């Protein structure tokens, strides 16, 4: 068994403004009721914390996503089905994360994560970053609004007229989630985590690090359960 301690950086597109995930991440429902998932230790939930200071008037992760979009100076209307938020899980192998916490370096670790997020995606685009301490392994749930600048990249078609495109801010998850960029994120994140004893997995390897893979599966299962429960509550309210 390998003793290598891996850095974990997992990106996923949210659905719309990703409000369904806010329940799990913020430990509360849209109407403010406390929600503790089955895999969380409610005795430790008070240790969870939001690391980003929201703008005045913004009270939640979901509102922070919309605030960024409304104030980004976008030239084009945001499509109904466009991805407005990218969710990012940041952590490391359980054994090393426990060492980081027990050695009093967790705050330094969170600071390094925030720096990497802001350097990588732009400070204004990092609208939320919640530290979870009530599950098995300490981890961060970061939320990035994929606003980019520069001309939109697309292949020209033969015979197609060329139009001048605006180069201002635009919402584009495709730009942020391109395959080449995803590989770069893994490299730069591992470099930022090196001082904490965490390193990147083997580039190009088809093998999955078991503990990391299990972590992802547990997270996705919990998300699905949260969404199903919230949908049931909405249907019940509509029936009433």
Language model features: what each stretch is:
Residues 1-240:
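N-terminal nicking endonuclease/strand-transfer module with a His-rich metal-binding environment
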């Amino acid at each position: 068994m390998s003793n290598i301690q891996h850095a974990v950086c997992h990106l996923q597109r949210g659905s719309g403004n990703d409000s369904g995930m806010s329940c799990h991440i913020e430990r509360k429902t849209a109407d403010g009721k406390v929600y503790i998932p089955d895999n969380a230790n409610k005795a430790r939930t008070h240790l969870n914390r939001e690391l980003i200071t929201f703008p005045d008037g913004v009270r939640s992760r979901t509102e922070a996503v919309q605030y960024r979009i409304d104030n980004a100076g976008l030239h084009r209307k945001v499509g109904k089905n466009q991805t407005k938020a990218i969710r990012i899980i940041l952590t490391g192998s359980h054994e090393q994360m426990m060492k980081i916490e027990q050695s009093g370096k967790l705050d330094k670790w969170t600071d390094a994560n925030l720096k990497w997020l802001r350097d990588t995606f732009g400070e204004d685009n990092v609208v939320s970053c919640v530290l979870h301490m009530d599950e098995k392994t300490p981890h961060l749930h970061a939320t990035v609004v994929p606003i980019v600048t520069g001309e939109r990249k697309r292949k020209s078609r033969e015979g197609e007229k060329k139009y001048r495109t605006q180069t201002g801010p635009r919402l584009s998850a495709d730009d942020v989630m391109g395959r080449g960029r995803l590989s770069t994120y893994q490299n730069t994140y591992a470099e930022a985590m090196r001082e904490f004893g965490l390193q990147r997995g083997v580039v190009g390897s088809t093998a999955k690090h078991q503990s990391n893979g299990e972590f992802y599966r547990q997270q996705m299962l919990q998300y699905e359960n949260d969404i199903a429960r919230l949908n049931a509550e909405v249907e019940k309210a509509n029936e009433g």
